């Protein structure tokens, strides 16, 4: 009996998409095939597609069954606890091993045979879901065990000590005799607040933040600094000047001398009383030196009183100097050389 609903194929037969062919039609296909009828003739006679007939006959020749679906039920489970244990062992020995290498080792070690060995995708799923978390946890535990104890952090700006309630309280605690006292800045390092301002980074804290009720000393506030002047400091003794003895000052004044040519430290010279610098005389670059050689060589090494800046060797330069050509100068030099020889 054909179903009342379905679709019609090219041969005019009715079929339901996604449903297997009824067992009666399957059995009829096998019987006709045993009678020697060709699959194409069976397809036309029963109005079943040629692909369906070929598939049913091929399955019957392989398994001897005409039932649809897998033969023998579902595939037996291959990811047994023993297989998972061996996979974990292989992964721990070689963390960089691949899934196909694990599959080959399972076959080589005899853990599985070719029928129940897990596929590469199954081994990858086992490594990801069952062994991955355990491996990471084991590495984390071993890292925590082998990790050295953290070193005590160096306190920020530990060289300078700052007044704080903790150090003040620590300073009040008496120390037993014979035990050296520990400074407050070393015994209790300063704890900075969780602020990231410039003053906190540079170690400059406001004095108003450091005032504590338990501190025995009075810390001036920022507002009080402006009122502090020279009048608040105790006056010096009459025999002392700025906190120094008069005798020491007189002794230093007695042996202190000002450099030659320079005014004293306490005296000032006005700019108007100083004469301007003398302007140097302009000398032409084309001026020739016409002094006698004997006057230049035999002259003394110091400047004469009657000499001028232009004639330091007491030899006068004529007022009117004529420009001589280069040829005349060369001829004169040649004549002097010849006469000297």
Swiss-Prot record:
CDD domains: PAX. Residues 4-130 bind DNA. Its main location: nucleus. InterPro entries: Homeodomain-like_sf, PAIRED_DNA-bd_dom, Paired_dom, PAX_fam, WH-like_DNA-bd_sf. Disulfide bonds: none annotated. One of its GO terms (molecular function) is RNA polymerase II cis-regulatory region sequence-specific DNA binding. It comes from the Eukaryota. Residues 168-189 are annotated as: Interaction with KDM5B. GO terms for cellular component: nucleus. Keywords: Developmental protein, DNA-binding, Nucleus, Paired box, Transcription, Transcription regulation. Residues 7-63 are annotated as: PAI subdomain. Residues 82-130 are annotated as: RED subdomain. It is found in: Nucleus. PANTHER family: PAIRED BOX PROTEIN PAX-6-RELATED-RELATED, PAIRED BOX PROTEIN PAX-9. Transcription factor required for normal development of thymus, parathyroid glands, ultimobranchial bodies, teeth, skeletal elements of skull and larynx as well as distal limbs. Interacts with KDM5B. This is Paired box protein Pax-9. It comes from Callithrix jacchus.
